[in-house]
Amino acid sequence: MAVYYTSNVGCYQQEPIFLNHQQQNQQASSSSAAASFTVTGGDTVRNEMVFIPPTTTGDVVTGNGTVSSSDLSFHDGQGLSLSLGTQISVAPFHFHQYQLGFTSQNPSISVKETSPFHVDEMSVKSKEMILLGQSDPSSGYAGNGGNGFYNNYRYNETSGGFMSSVLRSRYLKPAQNLLDEVVSVKKELNQMGKKKMKVNDFNSGSKEIEGGGGELSSDSNGKSIELSTIEREELQNKKNKLLTMVDEVDKRYNQYYHQMEALASSFEIVAGLGSAKPYTSVALNRISRHFRALRDAIKEQIQIVREKLGEKGGESLDEQQGERIPRLRYLDQRLRQQRALHQQLGMVRPAWRPQRGLPENSVSVLRAWLFEHFLHPYPKESEKIMLAKQTGLSKNQVANWFINARVRLWKPMIEEMYKEEFGDESELLISKSSQEPNSTNQEDSSSQQQQQQENNNNSNLAYSSADTTNIVFSSETKPDRVLGNDNDPQQQQINRSSDYDTLMNYHGFGVDDYRYISGSNQQESRFSNSHHLHDFVV
């Protein structure tokens, strides 16, 4: 037998109330007396219900007081509902039972006897009704125009006082409103359901109009056909832009999601695994709703444009593929324009080509080491190994880079620095060094000219001495010279001129061919000799 007693209300003696007839028959048939379980009134007792097991067998329960039958309310088909004399009005909060730990002390207690299978079915139905925002008749909560009361028999005995204080708190409703604003998706789901209902009503109305009279459909089809090519192109471009906007929204949402995951992982590394989930889940739900609303708005515009163009929904794969072809062309054109613009501004690298040389990161590390050791850019073996580890290159690659850098980069810089500091002196040295070979060349040329003059003088002397003997490169005597008069000055002048002609004509022939022309009869005679001219010069 189960009896309920109160603690802080006016107590008076009354007959106990039985939950079913079986317990009443057991109490009537039993003869053994037992002690009655009572709760004395006072402020020291907690303001909650105490469930007393059926142990009394007497006809009358004695005590300070029992609960009156007026405090117990039996709803038709709703189970037992008990209050302490006051109803707690709270804002509708559909997840008290599941989130705050409200559990039934004895779910099988009811006006009717229920099996455990029936209890499971009732619990499933109550969960579904709570998720749908409706009041569960079998639960302790009954919705009364947005307000309701919770039966305290649903609370745990250990947390009843705390829960009652929470439910009576003045901060409960603002907290519920804040959570509904940030997390709850119920309003938007209801709005989406209303939109779907409107769309279905519109579609059904349009179908009725098409079935009733074909004039409107023909007019609408005629309007879609009567579109000019310019208008059709404009609508097509608009549709392509809207489709690209949908792709951009999806891309941005994925980007946001990945960034949030990266941030959460970095936070969990510091704070612990799963510590970022309470923060990120709310933000993800909120942002996903914004993205979804934007995407739905763009989709509605696309649907309007399709209706203007007279296109269908494009559910089949062929139609979707036909839509993607012009959209891909548009995207390709846009990407090319952006790529050209970025290349002009220098924001993006050109297209990929086979890499020549080392990676830029490695080169930057090696160049930094070179400038740090600019006075002596010759790394040791240990330094080469260290640089190879830092750059991800091999030791030979590092050594080859430093060889090339010293030749192409370091040496020209040293030369420029030397020119800047010692530019005047180096120019003087260079001018002096350039003048010295010129002076030596001039001296050599002057000495050669002097030797040529001496040789010419000697040759003239040789030929002048030959005039006295009347023999020049020949063993035979010339009749003209023998018969001539030596005392005649005119004859002597002719002989000298002929000798000079022979000397001048010598330079026009080979080394071994010499020509002698007599001054008197101009007879030409040739002869060959193996001796050179300088052999005959004394």
From Swiss-Prot:
Compartment list: Nucleus
- Offer one Pfam family short name for this entry: POX
Q: Which InterPro entries match?
A: HD (IPR001356), Homeodomain-like_sf (IPR009057), KN_HD (IPR008422), POX_dom (IPR006563), TALE_homeobox (IPR050224)
Q: Which residues mediate DNA binding here? A: 351-413
Where do Low complexity bias regions lie?
Answer: 438-460
Q: Which domain of life is it from?
A: Eukaryota
Which parts of the sequence are annotated with region: Disordered? 201-223, 434-500
Return the Polar residues bias intervals: 461-476, 487-497
Stretches for region BELL domain: 231-302
Q: Which cellular component, as a GO term, is one annotated location? A: nucleus
Enumerate the GO terms in the molecular function aspect: DNA binding; DNA-binding transcription factor activity
Listed result of changing S218N: In strain: cv. Ag-0, cv. Bs-1, cv. Chi-1, cv. Cvi-0, cv. Kas-1, cv. Ita-0, cv. Landsberg erecta, cv. Lisse, cv. Me-0, cv. Mt-0, cv. Oy-0
Query: Region entry SR/KY domain: which residue ranges?
Result: 169-185
The entry's keywords: DNA-binding, Homeobox, Nucleus, Transcription, Transcription regulation
PANTHER family reported in the protein's UniProt record:
HOMEOBOX PROTEIN TRANSCRIPTION FACTORS
Q: Which family does it belong to?
A: Belongs to the TALE/BELL homeobox family.
What is the protein's quaternary organization?
Answer: Interacts with TLP1. May form heterodimeric complexes with TALE/KNOX proteins. Interacts with OFP1, OFP2, OFP4 and OFP5.
What the entry says about domains is: The SR/KY and BELL domains are responsive for the interaction between the TALE/BELL proteins and the TALE/KNOX proteins.
The name this protein goes by in its record: BEL1-like homeodomain protein 10
Which organism was this protein described from?
Answer: Arabidopsis thaliana
Q: What is the lineage of its organism?
A: Eukaryota, Viridiplantae, Streptophyta, Embryophyta, Tracheophyta
